[in-house]
Amino acid sequence: MAKSKFERVKPHINVGTIGHVDHGKTTLTAAITTILTRKFGGEAKSYAQIDSAPEERARGITINTSHVEYETDKRHYAHVDCPGHADYVKNMITGAAQMDGAILVVSAADGPMPQTREHILLARQVGVPYIIVFMNKADMVDDAELLELVEMEIRELLSKYDFPGDDTPIIIGSALKALEGDKGDIGEAAILKLAEVLDSYIPEPQRAIDGAFIMPVEDVFSISGRGTVVTGRVERGIVKVGDEIEIVGLRPTIKTTCTGVEMFRKLLDQGQAGDNVGILLRGTKREEVERGQVLAKPGSILPHTKFSAEIYVLSKEEGGRHTPFFAGYRPQFYFRTTDVTGSIELPAGVEMVMPGDNISVNVNLIAPIAMSDGLRFAIREGGRTVGAGVVAKVIE
């Protein structure tokens, strides 16, 4: 049989399972692929296949992640599942697996547990926009009142971290029963209900090309008779010849105009998200632009020096620090294409941060960087990665 071409006719959405250890995230992932494959085609994955997650690297950090995909009536989903808690923390902070929505798995028998809370907090900090709840192991609970109680607890916990607890869809089921072929309400029916909710509750994300133009500066050249060319990969949006552009970060913002876009030595009318381009700037001197700045649509992004962040500190085994760090620690923060020194403020009551920890901190940079909430960065010491982080909230 000839191999069928991957036809992307359906919109593509990225999701993942989160929740406490042993609440059934991987079993649910296996159940979703198994049941949706029967209905919409694709490839089913067993628990064992998903559980043996391969290693991948993101921002110098090794993470174990399983990727599966499945189809529903309306969409194509890419779904990530991690074997261990530390992998979730690293995955969410590095943005290795960007999620348009998360499926929070909570055991109906246990209710919310410490990692349930931590994953909800992480989802809030790193900007996962939507959470759907799958209350698993419902076959182990006979008491309807107990199910209601667990549901209330979950809703309260979501609201506490600024998710719409009262309106969050909660599906009650048993992933194991569904995998075993149970056609009842908590078996296959619950999985199909979950698929419907994924389709209806998570809106289609904005495509990168539809956003405001931004391009991190990688290199700057001066071409005699033509002016200054800035090269880089367009992160978001479209830039056209004649567009006004701001150069943001590291020094006061300046305005300029794009007078040419070239790619592979050919002149284009425009460059768009994903393209590696050279952008010719009118009247801008070579020394006015440097690596680490961004070219952006005027007013769409501002330079900042102070922000709160969620960070993960590499353990010694991962090639990170061997010793803890304390308040006032001054590493380099690597944003997009450059390092900027900054100091870390720890939360009240926290004396030190150990290798392998994740924590919320405030950061003060010595030079401004173009940023908005959700921007990822690496933490480095002399060019060596010792941590990863994400901007939770810009302060000033």
Curated annotation (Swiss-Prot):
Residues 60-64 are annotated as: G2. SUPFAM superfamilies: EF-Tu/eEF-1alpha/eIF2-gamma C-terminal domain (SSF50465), P-loop containing nucleoside triphosphate hydrolases (SSF52540), Translation proteins (SSF50447). GTP binds at residues 19-26, 81-85, 136-139. Residues 81-84 are annotated as: G3. It comes from the Bacteria. Mg(2+) binds at residue 26. Residues 19-26 are annotated as: G1. Residues 10-206 form the tr-type G domain. Residues 174-176 are annotated as: G5. GTP hydrolase that promotes the GTP-dependent binding of aminoacyl-tRNA to the A-site of ribosomes during protein biosynthesis. PANTHER family: ELONGATION FACTOR TU, MITOCHONDRIAL, ELONGATION FACTOR TU-RELATED. This is Elongation factor Tu 2. It comes from Nitrosomonas eutropha (strain DSM 101675 / C91 / Nm57). The gene is tuf2.
